Structure formats: C-alpha cells, structure tokens
Regions:
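Acidic donor-binding loop of glycosyltransferase active sites
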Residues: 283-293
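N-terminal subdomain of nucleotide-sugar transferases
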Residues: 2-98
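Active-site-proximal region of nucleotide-activated glycan assembly enzymes
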Residues: 141-193
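Conserved N-terminal ligand/cofactor-binding loop architecture of enzyme catalytic domains
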Residues: 76-138
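C-terminal amphipathic helix plus adjacent low-complexity
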Residues: 5, 12, 16, 347-402
Length: 402
C-alpha cells in the first residue's frame, strides 16, 4: 500500500514534520515499532510504503494557537478518542504555524494575542487583509482561510446548518459534510452535575442566584467595569441585602484578578484565574456574561445558561452574536450598566424570561458533538484502511502549507 504525498522538492520539509510529530517511524522509539515505512522517491513523487498492517492508528490534528478555542477543540477531540477507543488511537495535536513555519507565521500566536487586546488594531488588520482589498494570492490564502472550505477533504464537520450551507456553496458535496456541532471537552458532555452540590463544593451561596462573568482565556473585555456595575445593581439598597452573587473568571490576566480581589463588595463575589473545570462553574451558575467566543457559547448552551454577550473579536466572532440572539438564547450589549440591569431583572422581576432563555439554550446545545465526530472518523478509517485512497489534491495542499 502506498500514498503519493508531495513533489520531491517538498520532501525535506515533509520529512521534518513527520519526524518531529514522531508518528511514521522516521525517528526512534516505540512509534517506529508500531509502524514503519520505506521512503521511495520516483519521478518527482515521494511514496510511503507501509510495512506491517498491525499498528496503533495515528491521528494528527493541525491547529493554530491563536485564541483558546482552537486548542480547546483539538484537545476535546483528542480526549474523546481516548475515552471511546483507548489505545487504539494515538492522537497528536500540533500548532502547524508555530512548530513548522518560518517568520512571521511562527510568531502568529504572540501577534494575535497582542492585537485582540487592542481591538481596533485587530479590526484594521483583519479587514485590510480581506480579499476584497488584497489581490495577492498568498495574502488572500492566509487572511481569508477562515472562510474557505477545501473540496478535497473526505469529511467537513460543521458546527451548524448555516456553516454546512456555506460549505456546499463553496464546492463541497453533501456527502462530505456532517453537522454535529462544535467539539467541546468531554467533561461537559458526560458529567452529571447537580447545581446545589456544585455550589457546596465551590463554596458558593446556596440560596442566591449566580451570574458567571468571563473574559476569555486572556481575561479580555470590559470585565472590571461590568463586575463593579453588577456589584452595585445586585445589592438591594432598600432591603440592605444582595439579590445575587457573582463569579468572575479572569483567565491568565493576573493584574485584573488582583485588582478585583482588592475591591470591597456588597454581594458575595469569587474571583478566579484560569480554570480547567469550567463545567462546574457553569453548572453552578444561572446565567453567563462573556464575549462571543464559539467554544464558550457552545459550553454555555450545554449547561442551559442564558448568555449576555458583551463583546466580540471583529471578523471571526461577529457572526456568533446573531446566532445566540436570534435563537432566543441570550442578548447582546456592550454597556456594563445595561448588562447589570438585565441580570438584576432576571434575578428578580423577569425570572420567566431567564427560564425561557435557558430552555432555548438547551434546544441549541449539541453535547455529543465531539463523540459523534470521533466515531465518524473511526468509521472512515475502518472503511478506507490506513493511508488508503487519500486524494492527492488534499495531500499536496497540506504540503504547500509546510
């Protein structure tokens, strides 16, 4: 069995990728024992010939660590493979730009994090590299990659019907697409969580409704102003008691966490840094305030949390706002005072609206998406066999990125 991978002029780069990933027996160690290949170069092509069919199947996930959502989805797929298939699959998650590209692409993570913290700068960069302004092929290929679908893929997993329709318009066949939802950490999908128990575990007030305020992994957005507005609005001055409690997730923003911890609060407040068990914090709360990151939205929907979107990154996150609002699962406002007013109403005079939005959120939720994806990949692998029938148009395009 052989697979034509790339023209000879690319073979050194491709060898480097496979060697550093450690999957295909180019290096030493246990992976070489599981599966070895002879490398044969002939008439401008490089072929990998498998020796021995019995081996652990390998999955290579290529991603870019520009924003927490990409890595989170990749790691969710990796974890789902482990839960579903154990040692049958070995999964490698690689940042293709950082690990295998040259400058400036290998510096994208640092540049991206700087620009999204300065939203207007990111907005200018995003739209100035749009194909409608730039005709250079290579710039368009990078800048507009988020909106393109490769017609040579075996399968394209779409988070929604709207995305699937766009894929069909861009040349994919219906048989190539599957609408399973966004892959979310298995802990969100299969955990059986009881709100009262979680509040005891997390040392929260068991009687007061709770709002979760998030700023993403980097602690972005108007977190401080919103927190202070909530601290005032969720305190009933007439009765001199709180009507709600506040959980603030500051991510990796240690300065923000330190500032918020130093403030005096009239209501119960917990300030937390980067968290790895968000399913518990979401499960213990009644609504969430966050920017329009797709991963956080998908997680909130699974937990049935009404969502207040208070910001979005121009370009890739803008379309997430109408998805939440138009489906009745939340609202959008950039005003900290308006945000605090909405939460106070949900916790007092508009509890029916809060309940209705929670029900709508659960209707949109797709908790089994990550398991549906890995099961479908497994079925494809079983049908096609290892390294069989992979279209050259796909492999050649991958090689061009290296």
């Amino acid at each position: 069995m052989a697979m034509t991978v790339a023209p000879t002029r690319k073979s050194s780069s491709l060898n480097s990728v496979f060697q550093r990933v450690g999957v295909y027996g180019f290096g030493s160690g246990s992976s070489q024992k599981r599966c070895k290949y002879d490398i044969q170069e002939e008439e401008g092509t490089m072929e990998m010939v498998q020796i021995g069919a019995e081996r652990t199947k390998n999955v290579l996930i290529l991603m870019s660590d520009t924003g927490g959502g990409h890595r989170a989805s990749a790691e969710a797929i990796r974890d789902a493979f482990r839960l579903e298939f154990g040692d049958e699959y070995q999964v490698f998650v690689k940042d293709v730009w950082k690990e295998y590209a040259g400058w400036p692409l290998n510096d994208m993570e640092r540049s991206y994090k700087f620009m999204v913290k300065h939203v207007q700068l990111w907005k200018v960069a995003f739209h100035s590299t749009s194909p409608k302004w730039i005709h250079s092929c290579y710039l368009a290929a990078i800048a507009a990659f988020y909106a393109k679908f490769h017609p040579g893929v075996n399968r394209c997993y779409c988070p929604s019907e709207e995305v699937a329709k766009r894929a069909l318009l861009d040349g994919l066949e219906e048989s190539q697409t599957r609408v399973f939802g966004l892959p979310i950490r298995p802990s969100f999908c299969r955990a059986v969580l009881v709100k009262d128990d979680l509040r005891v575990e997390l040392e929260m007030d068991c009687q007061l409704p709770a709002v979760l305020l998030m700023g993403g992994g980097e602690g972005m957005g108007p977190v401080k102003k919103t927190a202070k507005a909530l601290g005032e609005t969720l305190f009933d001055e007439r009765l001199q008691k709180p009507i709600g409690q506040l959980i603030i997730i500051c991510g990796r923003n240690k300065d923000l966490a330190s500032t918020l911890e130093s403030l005096e609060w009239k209501i119960p407040v917990k300030v937390k840094g980067f968290q790895t068990q968000m399913e518990k914090w979401m499960g213990a709360c009644d609504c969430i305030i966050t920017k329009a990151g797709p991963g956080t939205i998908a997680e909130a929907l699974i937990r049935g949390l009404p969502i207040i979107l208070n910001d979005y990154i121009p370009g890739q996150e803008k379309g997430n706002v109408p998805y939440v609002v138009d489906n009745g699962a939340g609202v959008f406002t950039r005003s900290p005072k308006e945000t605090a007013k909405l939460v106070a109403e949900w916790f007092s005079t508009k509890t029916d609206e809060l309940k209705r939005m929670s029900e709508n959120a659960l209707k949109l939720a797709q908790p089994n998406a990550v398991f549906d994806i890995v099961k479908d990949i497994h079925e494809l692998a079983c049908q096609r066999g290892p390294l069989a029938n992979i279209p050259y148009v796909f492999t050649s395009s991958f090689s061009s990125l290296i």
